[in-house]
């Protein structure tokens, strides 16, 4: 119905444009109104007369007769919805007879039909369309009950003559209005207006035209598979359409067991098929149609639970796949948790490294302040009376002044030193070191780090044995030298043996 109403709106707009482009003469309007009056008197010939009038009117398209308005003072007449129009009800709407000649538009109505084709009165349809007609650009369309609440125009606004045109709010409408913004006039009001218009030639300017579509075909409504749109109002319900089922599939229900015992002999029931829970669609085969039973139907005849088993197996496969996905997700989550733990350990390692770097920096700072004294050897040639030679200054490893550690090792106090003689990191102070800091002279006949001097002690013999064992001589020669070492007596013989051994090893 929405598509049909939209088509009516489109045709009405085309009529309006045609009327504006080529106004209709008064003679053509009178002829059309006369034909319309005959249609209203004989409703059975309504459609045939409409076709003749539409074919005879000049410069108009097919739906133009539904929206013809007088532009030259003519008196239009409007089709009624069946016989029974009264000529005595001009005062029911509060419209004087003298104002009936001011009408320049026609009024037509929409009826709402149910699915059986019967007209329903007083039901508002959000998709009913009120089309604009006439040449006047200020003509308006009145909204429905819901939309009159949001209208900017006061309800019951009087016209120029001081009479109320309608009891509903009205608002201007443009060419691109929505179908849901238009109301359906009440059936009683439409009948009253049609009676008044069919009688008098003068009619107040209503400012709207209602298009009356033909009643729907009940047979078409019953066979249509598409539900009819009943609007967007929450108070309305869509009942849809009913379609007779043409399918032959289904399962035959089991018959109840009769409690009474049969009086006669029983019939054999060995070939009776068992009951099934469901059955596939059985298509009747005819030579003309050429249809055959599908292989799936034949397979279903072999076992009633085939589809159930297949569906159960599919469900089991889906459950197995979901369980596998869940297991994989759990593995991924566990790995992510381990990664988070490793991240925490890495952060703790970084903190420990930072602490160690701080400690190393602290140790470097302490080492930079340490002074190491390096004493000299031998006697001072300028002081022959001195027992030992002392280092003229204490040289630090890391750059410091040379006189910093002298106060701790010299006999003289720090205040008695001559500081003016300190130049280029050296001092002229000649004070003696304390006894515990003085070095003893090295004896040439005693073993030291400078060289090994053998004696008659067991330590000297152990050193010579170690020299023989660590040498790269043959094993026989090593055993022979060990035997000679055991036989040597005296310090001189041992010193000669040591010299001979060193010559053999150095070869």
Swiss-Prot record:
InterPro entries: P/V_Pprotein_paramyxoviral, Paramyxo_P/V_N, RNA_pol_Pprot-P_XD_paramyxovir
Record region (X domain (XD)): 457-507
Region (Multimerization) residue spans: 304-376
Biased composition range(s): Acidic residues: 146-160
Highest taxon, organism lineage: Viruses
Residues that, per the record, bind Ca(2+): 314
Gene Ontology molecular function, alphabetical: metal ion binding; RNA binding; RNA-directed RNA polymerase activity
Intrachain disulfide bonds: none
Pfam families membership: Paramyx_P_V_C, Paramyxo_P_V_N
Region annotation (Interaction with N0) ranges: 1-48
Family statement drawn from the similarity comment of this UniProt entry: Belongs to the morbillivirus P protein family.
Protein task: Essential cofactor of the RNA polymerase L that plays a central role in the transcription and replication by forming the polymerase complex with RNA polymerase L and recruiting L to the genomic N-RNA template for RNA synthesis. Also plays a central role in the encapsidation of nascent RNA chains by forming the encapsidation complex with the nucleocapsid protein N (N-P complex). Acts as a chaperone for newly synthesized free N protein, so-called N0, allowing encapsidation of nascent RNA chains during replication.
Domain notes: The N-terminus consists of a long intrinsically disordered tail. The central part contains the coiled-coil multimerization domain (MD). Forms a four-stranded coiled coil structure. The C-terminus constitutes the alpha-helical domain (XD) that binds to the nucleocapsid (N-RNA complex).
Protein's name according to its UniProt entry: Phosphoprotein
UniProt lineage: Viruses, Riboviria, Orthornavirae, Negarnaviricota, Haploviricotina
């Amino acid at each position: 119905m929405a598509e049909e109403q939209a088509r009516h709106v489109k045709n009405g707009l085309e009529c309006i444009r045609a009327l504006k482009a080529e106004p209709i003469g008064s003679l053509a309007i009178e002829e059309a109104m006369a034909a319309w009056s005959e249609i209203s008197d004989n409703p059975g010939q309504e459609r045939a007369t409409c076709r003749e009038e539409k074919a005879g009117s000049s410069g108009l398209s097919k739906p133009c007769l539904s929206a013809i308005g007088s532009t030259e003072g003519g008196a239009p007449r409007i089709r009624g919805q069946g016989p029974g129009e009264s000529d005595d009800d001009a005062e029911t709407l509060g419209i004087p007879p003298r104002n009936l000649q001011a009408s320049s538009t026609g009024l037509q109505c929409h009826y709402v039909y149910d699915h059986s084709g019967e007209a329903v009165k007083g039901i508002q349809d959000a998709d009913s369309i009120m089309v604009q007609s006439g040449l006047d650009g200020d003509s308006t369309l009145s909204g429905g009950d819901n939309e009159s609440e949001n209208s900017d125009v006061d309800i019951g606004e009087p016209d120029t003559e001081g009479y109320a045109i309608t009891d509903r709010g009205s608002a201007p409408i443009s060419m691109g209005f929505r179908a849901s913004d238009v109301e359906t006039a009440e059936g009683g009001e439409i009948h009253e207006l049609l009676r008044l218009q069919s009688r008098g030639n003068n009619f107040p300017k209503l400012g709207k035209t209602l298009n009356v579509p033909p009643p729907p075909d009940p047979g078409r409504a019953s066979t249509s598979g598409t539900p009819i749109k009943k609007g967007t109002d929450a108070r309305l319900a869509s009942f849809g359409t009913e379609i007779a089922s043409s399918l032959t599939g289904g399962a035959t229900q089991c018959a109840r067991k009769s409690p009474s015992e049969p009086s006669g002999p029983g019939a054999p029931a060995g070939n009776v098929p068992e009951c099934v829970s469901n059955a596939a669609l059985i298509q009747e085969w005819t030579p003309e149609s050429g249809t055959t039973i599908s292989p799936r139907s034949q397979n279903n005849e072999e076992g009633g639970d085939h589809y159930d088993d297949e569906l159960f197996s599919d469900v089991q496969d889906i459950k197995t796949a979901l369980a596998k996905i869940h297991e994989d997700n759990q593995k991924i989550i566990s790995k992510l948790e381990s990664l988070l733990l490793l991240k925490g350990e890495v952060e703790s390692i970084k903190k420990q490294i930072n602490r160690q770097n701080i400690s190393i920096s602290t140790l470097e700072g302490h080492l930079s302040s340490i002074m190491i004294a390096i004493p000299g050897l031998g006697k001072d040639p300028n002081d022959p009376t001195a027992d030992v030679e002392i280092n003229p200054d204490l040289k630090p490893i890391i750059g410091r002044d040379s006189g910093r550690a002298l106060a701790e090792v010299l006999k003289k106090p720090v205040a008695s030193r001559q500081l003016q003689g300190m130049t280029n990191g050296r001092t002229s102070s000649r004070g003696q070191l304390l006894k515990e800091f003085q070095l003893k002279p090295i004896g040439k006949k005693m073993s030291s780090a400078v060289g090994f001097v053998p004696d008659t002690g067991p330590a000297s013999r152990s050193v010579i044995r170690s020299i023989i064992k660590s040498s790269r001589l043959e094993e026989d020669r090593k055993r022979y030298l060990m035997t000679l070492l055991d036989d040597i007596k005296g310090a001189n013989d041992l010193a000669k043996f040591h010299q001979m051994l060193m010559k053999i090893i150095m070869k």
